[in-house]
Amino acid sequence: MDIFYNLIKCLIFSTYWLLIANITFRVLIKRRNIPYSMSWLLTIYIIPFIGISIWFFFGELYLGKRQKKIANRIWSISNKWLHELKSCTYIFQIKNSEVATSIFQLCKNRQGLHGIKSKKIKLLTNTKKIMQILIRDIYLARKNIEMVFYIWKPGGMADDVAIALIDSAKRGIHCRLMLDSAGSIEFFQSPWVEIMRKSGIQVVEALKVNLLRVFLRRVDVRQHRKIILIDNYIAYSGSMNLVDPYLFKKSSEIGQWIDLMTRIEGPIATTMGIIYSCDWEIETGLKILPQLPNKKMLENQSNKNASIQVIASGPGFLKNMIHQALLTAIYSAKRELIITTPYLVPSEDLLEAICTAAQRGVEVSIIIPLYNDSILVKWASRVFFSELLEAGVKIFQFQKGLLHSKSILVDQQLSLIGTVNLDMRSLWLNFEITLVIDDSDFGRNLFCIQNKYISDSQLIDKKAWSMRAYWKRILEKIFYFLSPLL
């Protein structure tokens, strides 16, 4: 009996140290920043059994075996389609403003495409109005409607959109709906799934959460994009999930979610369509390449000087592209930089870029919500305040709800709008999308919106912040240690 007991104990001990050695090796061979690597190593050594479990859930960036195989071959096939798109020279805007030149060169060199022209481009800030415009566009659709969202929560205005989709599918419009499994769990547990499928809508549950497969696929890689495509001509993207803001997370008592969406008419829908096609193929194995744009798309063009790039991230997409674009945009600022983000846990490079911008004379403002739905992110964000304030950055805390908008405005000319939060999950893990827009009219509109956010915010006083309670500083340091893992 003692021999058997000692054998089991020896086996457990050996397995434990083999796991520790394996994880240590995996962390060290990855070219990640030092704080990220140190956080993981300290986690598995200080809280070993829990740390090992956390690693298998969240440590490696990988998809399921079938999805990974599809993702690896996606761009080789899509590149053929992109080569055909390049022949449509009439959709490209070759010239850019001075402040946007660097980021558009980055996009051109890495993605292979110049900026895209647009017929109309509009910023939308009122969720009720956004839903009304969207429902109108759905009913006016002639060929196809494609959507992807992180969260679709049944109830209120979201049900109105669902009914519009069902009615459109019944009249012969080809409708595809892709929703993240974790974010839209309430939707997939509701009758809407069956109702939609019976009407002819193709509904796909993206990145299915399956606890039996946690050792085969990372569970916190999420489909975080928000895209709506109609007739290969109208495109929506931004921070808004398909939820009624008057009903969403009311119990959290943080107030209404404040979002920002962009509605664009023109060939940019084609570029966003190839991203949707890749996502759809990863989930279903089926390729649905969009049609090439025609010249009629740009007739009566109202934004003749506007240029747009679309940047996508996630497994199978260009590595570090969004992170590089953010850095390039920040370093391009000469006069003013305004950043709006609900979650502020930047990488060391982004933190350095923001501080450097302020130190070279750029007026830098960061707008974040005073109230947050994530206690972890709330405290992790606070640890960066001192360094930012010391560099001369103005930090505004929005008081009228959860500011969920994600935007960057450089010199009132270059705008970045999309789904990316300034945290590790958005920058390195999730499927995200960012629109890069070079247009002074659009920039002025975004500037007005951001100024409205600022007027509804309180400015953090540098002196008062330096006198905050000692226990708060301790909590901040604890969450700073965890920040690379968030």
Curated annotation (Swiss-Prot):
Signal peptide: none annotated. It comes from the Bacteria. One of its GO terms (cellular component) is plasma membrane. It is a multi-pass membrane protein. The active site is at 224, 226, 231, 404, 406, 411. Its EC number is 2.7.8.-. SUPFAM superfamilies: Phospholipase D/nuclease (SSF56024). Residues 219-246, 399-426 form the PLD phosphodiesterase domain. It is found in: Cell inner membrane. Its main location: membrane. PROSITE patterns: PLD (PS50035). InterPro entries: Cardiolipin_synthase, CL_synthase_A, CLS_N, PLD-like_dom, PLipase_D/transphosphatidylase. Catalyzes the reversible phosphatidyl group transfer from one phosphatidylglycerol molecule to another to form cardiolipin (CL) (diphosphatidylglycerol) and glycerol. Belongs to the phospholipase D family. Cardiolipin synthase subfamily. ClsA sub-subfamily. This is Cardiolipin synthase A.
